[in-house]
């Protein structure tokens, strides 16, 4: 992939592993602290990055409005309607002309709306992600606390940088952990930037967010349900609550990544595993958002080319009914996540859920071809 980072940009390369038994790991050496330090220091944006942040806000709003009347989105709104904000402030909901609600519930409702059609931005590396999932919780918090547009933009930039750096350096799916485990700490870091919180508070927020967001990938296997849209929205809500608790002075489990009973040791590669995470060096402006990309079609990112192929075959008037067998030569990710390599018989069932079929290369090709 072509990176849009500028020549000469400096990064800090962080080696992350389980710390030795019987030894304490100073917080300044912990990944969560380094993320928090980056978040607290982020205070300026390049002009082209500012434009891209605007693009991502527009894209999120568009896909949310497209999904606004789908049942999972309506039900998420109903949950938020139970938590109107009693004072001045609060956050708005997609699909409602008025009213403000507690930001954590607005984040949930709006997060489901953005995620429902699987049509917002994407970033694939060692793991998978939709970094635009960070925007609904950040926007909700910004509305409730009255943040400026600049502070919101800086928060979004930090969240993208954090999530995409984690996705580049730490593979979750090989251990059947869902990618919301990278999303929640990214949201916490972004809120920290937007609210000008101290490193200590952001650090505790990142720890708690990750601790609570380590879900399995069953949400994306077998009979896939609307929880696929709720999972990132719930992670955003969790991050908001973590920040609220940390602001009151409460502490969280640490070292969350490197601890002997932490995430790496027991949920990822184990006590002997080492991961490399790259964050902007001190004084460097985050730019990872420039490496995210949007979709043309409402389906898994790896299905975009398959849909185009199906349309092309349809245009050539090749009758699908006369085809006995189709071989798709594709990537490892496509084969195992949306192809026959997934081992999910549900992906071959035309009556399966929408969430299942938008992750089925077989179904997607057939529909586009027809």
What is the meaning of each model-derived region?
Residues 127-130, 180, 299, 354, ...:
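Aromatic-acidic/polar surface patches that form glycan- and anion
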Residues 288-298, 302:
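Glycine-rich phosphate/diphosphate-binding loops and the adjacent beta-loop-alpha structural elements
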Residues 1-10:
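Short, Lys/Arg-enriched N-terminal segments with co-localized hydrophobic residues
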Residues 14-19, 301-370:
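Intrinsically disordered, low-complexity Ser/Thr/Pro/Gly-rich interaction regions
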Residues 9-290, 341:
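N-terminal core-entry segment
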């Amino acid at each position: 992939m072509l990176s849009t980072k500028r020549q000469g940009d400096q990064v800090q390369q962080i080696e992350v592993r389980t710390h030795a038994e019987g030894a304490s790991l100073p917080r300044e050496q912990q990944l969560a602290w380094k993320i928090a330090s980056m978040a607290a220091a982020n205070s300026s944006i390049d002009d082209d990055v500012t434009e891209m942040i605007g693009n991502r806000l527009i894209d999120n709003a568009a896909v949310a409005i497209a999904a606004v009347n789908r049942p999972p989105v309506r039900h998420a709104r109903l949950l938020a309607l139970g938590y109107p904000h009693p004072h001045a402030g609060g956050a708005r909901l997609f699909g409602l002309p008025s009213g403000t609600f507690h930001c954590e519930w607005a984040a949930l409702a709006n997060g489901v709306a953005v995620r429902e059609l699987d049509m917002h931005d994407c970033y694939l590396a060692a793991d998978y992600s939709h970094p635009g999932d960070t925007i609904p919780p950040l926007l909700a918090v910004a509305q409730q606390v009255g943040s400026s547009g600049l502070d919101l933009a800086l928060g979004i930039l930090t969240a993208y940088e954090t999530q995409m750096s984690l996705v580049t350096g730490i593979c979750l799916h090989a251990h059947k952990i869902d990618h919301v485990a990278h999303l929640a700490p990214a949201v916490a870091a972004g809120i920290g930037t937007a609210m000008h919180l101290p490193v200590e508070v952001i650090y505790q927020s990142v720890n708690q967010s990750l601790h609570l967001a380590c879900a399995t990938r069953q949400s994306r296997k077998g009979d896939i349900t609307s929880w696929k849209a709720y999972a990132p929205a719930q992670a955003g809500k969790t991050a908001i609550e973590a920040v609220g608790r940390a602001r009151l002075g409460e502490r969280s489990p640490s070292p969350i990544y490197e601890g002997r009973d932490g995430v790496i040791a027991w949920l990822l590669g184990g006590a002997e595993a080492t991961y490399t995470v790259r964050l902007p060096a001190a004084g460097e402006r985050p730019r990872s958002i420039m490496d995210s990309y949007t979709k043309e079609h409402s389906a898994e990112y790896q299905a975009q080319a398959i849909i185009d192929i199906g349309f092309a075959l349809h245009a050539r008037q090749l009758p699908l009914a006369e085809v006995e067998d189709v071989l798709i030569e594709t990537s490892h990710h496509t084969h195992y996540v949306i192809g026959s390599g997934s081992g999910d018989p549900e992906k071959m069932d035309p009556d399966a859920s929408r969430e299942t079929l938008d992750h089925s290369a077989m179904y997607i090709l057939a529909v586009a071809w027809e």
